[in-house]
Amino acid sequence: MSPRSRTFALLALLVAMAGPARAEPSRGASGELVVENPERGTSLRVRLRPGEVFSVVYQHSIYEQPVIEDFVLDEGGRIVLRAVTSPSAAVREYFGITSAGERHAMARPMSEIVFRIATGTAQRLRAGGVERSFLELGEHGDRLVMRAHPS
C-alpha cells in the first residue's frame, strides 16, 4: 500500500470511528412568554426566538441592591434561569452563590415563576427587544405568574 493510500485509509478509519456529525445542542426553544395577573385578568405575551434571553430587572426587596435575572425557554416548555447578576455579595448569597464576581451562570428550570409587584420600584421585564414595567399588569403588591408556552 502506498503512503498516500495509507493516509487515505487512516483518514477514512478516523471519520468512521467519529460517527455521524451532530448539530450543536439547543440552547433554548422558541415560544411565547406569558405574564399574567390572575386577579385582574391582565396578561402580557411576548414571542421569543430560539435561545433568546429575557430578563427581569429589579431592586432586591431585602438588600435594596440591583439584580438582573436572565432566562431562556427550554424545549420542555419551562423557564430556565441562566444567570444572576448583582454587585451585592449579600444578594448573590441569597441565591446560593458564594463565589466572587457579579455575574454567575445558573441552570435552574421552573414550570412557572410567581412575582409580587414590588412596593418600591417595580420590576421590569426585558423581552423581545422591549422593556416593560410590571406595573403595566397591575398595582404594587399584585401577584404575577410567568409561564412559557412553547410553539
Locations of regions flagged by a protein language model:
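Residue-level marker of positions within ordered structural domains that often coincide
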Residues: 1, 13, 76
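Bacterial N-terminal signal peptides that target proteins for export
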Residues: 1-8
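Bacterial N-terminal signal peptides
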Residues: 9-17
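N-terminal membrane-targeting segments
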Residues: 18-24
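N-terminal secretory signal peptides
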Residues: 24-86
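Mature, soluble, non-transmembrane domains
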Residues: 54, 74-151
